């Protein structure tokens, strides 16, 4: 059974990453799940258990992306980016830092995928219009994609990984925020420093800001633009209310997304059908299917091996526990994608004989590693693969070799510093 469960997992993962002839990841994952069920690797009760774990996470994620797609069509993100350019006042370094800060804000509230896939094309268009060379463009593109993941820690909704882990361990919105806001700030600061050190010679010292358009010119629907700010406030309150009412956060985000869609349906700035079609609905099928396959690894006893490893490193104290878990999840995410990694690790943490603060350290370090680890390799997350594809369509080609070289140099120090932020949070607060 162990061999069969492992084989089903590896073949499913291979087809998810390869996507031959555009094969949808949702179909691939469900096929793997179907094979796991009919071969007896997982039971029907496992299917219901997995669905119970992931439905809230995936629907929340889809709702947030829907909202972000509307905001993008309205022009909110471009409006924000133009403000950042004007605030830079022709200083290349300031522009670099401000774009990173904007990316961090977008990632926090609209998820890492939204930040990377929506903000990157906007930034790319801007630096091209300014007249930057290809060498000067590269740092801004990498920074836009990198910061989307490294600062997707603070809120449960900032990353699908966060939602799944929080749901699995029944962690509320406020408690999660209280544990991850400091690590996120550590990650943000470390990202700015490391990215600047790595790209300092390529970032232009100055640029001509005379031809940058006015922020208001980016707004495609002024009425909907004003409504957007109200929607954002209501969305934040929805997150907080879910903490106290125990109502799944997907209920709030879903209702808000639906109302926003209804308000936007008469706008000339966007096509509602295209927005709905552009949402990552296949993520729902992928999550359910992939996690059923992962449960096969649990049933075969493979996650118990990892649980024993976690018990071993926990014997060396909180600092070693956090570093060990963080780098294990980062490594696994980089070689087999962060989506299965976070649940495999979560199951192992639950199976381990680790309790109290040490267990808490494992839980949050797993999230950090699964959020940051994917930046090491192109296959670390589905969003990165799509991000690279979008850039290729816009005539910006980044080879896997170049990505890996850049990713590993930048990610390792940022991951280490972020884990230190988690350690300090747990021992001080």
UniProtKB/Swiss-Prot annotation:
One of its GO terms (biological process) is response to arsenic-containing substance. It is found in: Cell membrane. The chain crosses the membrane at residues 3-23, 25-45, 50-70, 99-119, 137-157, 180-200, 222-242, 244-264, 275-295, 316-336, 372-392, 408-428. Pfam families: ArsB. It is a multi-pass membrane protein. It comes from the Bacteria. The keyword Aminoacyl-tRNA synthetase does not apply. Keywords: Arsenical resistance, Cell membrane, Membrane, Transmembrane, Transmembrane helix, Transport. One of its GO terms (cellular component) is plasma membrane. The keyword Transport applies. GO terms for molecular function: arsenite transmembrane transporter activity. Involved in arsenical resistance. Thought to form the channel of an arsenite pump. Belongs to the ArsB family. This is Arsenical pump membrane protein.
């Amino acid at each position: 059974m162990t061999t069969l469960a492992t084989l089903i997992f590896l073949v499913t993962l291979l087809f998810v990453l390869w996507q031959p002839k555009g094969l949808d990841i949702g179909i691939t994952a469900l096929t793997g799940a179907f094979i796991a069920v009919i071969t007896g690797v997982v039971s029907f009760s496992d299917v219901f258990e997995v669905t119970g774990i992931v439905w809230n996470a995936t629907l929340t994620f889809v709702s947030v992306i829907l909202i972000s797609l509307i905001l993008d069509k309205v022009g909110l993100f471009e409006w924000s980016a133009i403000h950042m350019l004007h605030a830079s006042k022709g200083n290349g370094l300031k522009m670099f830092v401000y774009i990173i800060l904007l990316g961090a804000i977008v990632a926090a509230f609209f998820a890492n995928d939204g930040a990377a896939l929506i903000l990157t094309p906007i930034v790319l268009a801007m630096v091209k219009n300014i007249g930057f060379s290809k060498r000067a463009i590269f740092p801004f593109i990498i920074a836009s994609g990198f910061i989307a993941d490294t600062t997707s820690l603070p809120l449960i909704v900032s990353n699908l990984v966060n939602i799944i882990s929080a749901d699995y361990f029944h962690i509320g919105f406020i408690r999660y925020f209280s544990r991850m806001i400091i690590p996120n700030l550590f990650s943000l600061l470390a990202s700015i420093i490391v990215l600047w050190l790595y790209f300092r010679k390529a970032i232009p010292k100055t640029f001509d800001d005379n031809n940058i358009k006015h922020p208001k010119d980016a707004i495609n629907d002024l009425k909907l633009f004003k409504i957007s700010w109200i929607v954002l406030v209501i969305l934040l309150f929805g997150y907080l209310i879910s903490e106290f009412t125990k109502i799944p956060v997907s209920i709030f985000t879903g209702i808000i997304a639906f109302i926003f869609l209804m308000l936007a349906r008469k706008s000339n700035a966007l096509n509602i059908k295209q927005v709905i079609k552009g949402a990552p609905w296949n993520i729902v099928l992928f999550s359910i299917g992939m996690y059923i396959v992962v449960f096969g690894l649990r049933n075969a006893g493979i996650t118990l091996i990892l649980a024993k490893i976690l018990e071993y490193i926990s014997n060396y104290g909180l600092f070693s526990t956090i570093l060990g878990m963080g780098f294990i999840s980062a490594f696994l995410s980089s070689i087999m994608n962060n989506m299965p990694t976070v649940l495999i690790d979560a199951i192992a943490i639950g199976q381990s004989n680790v309790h109290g603060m040490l267990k808490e350290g494992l839980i949050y370090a797993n999230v950090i590693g699964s959020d940051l680890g994917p930046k090491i390799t192109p296959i670390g997350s589905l969003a990165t693969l799509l991000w690279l594809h979008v850039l290729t369509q816009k005539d910006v080609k980044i080879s896997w070799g170049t990505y890996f070289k850049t990713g590993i140099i930048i990610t390792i120090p940022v991951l280490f510093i972020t884990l230190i932020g988690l350690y300090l949070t747990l021992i001080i607060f």
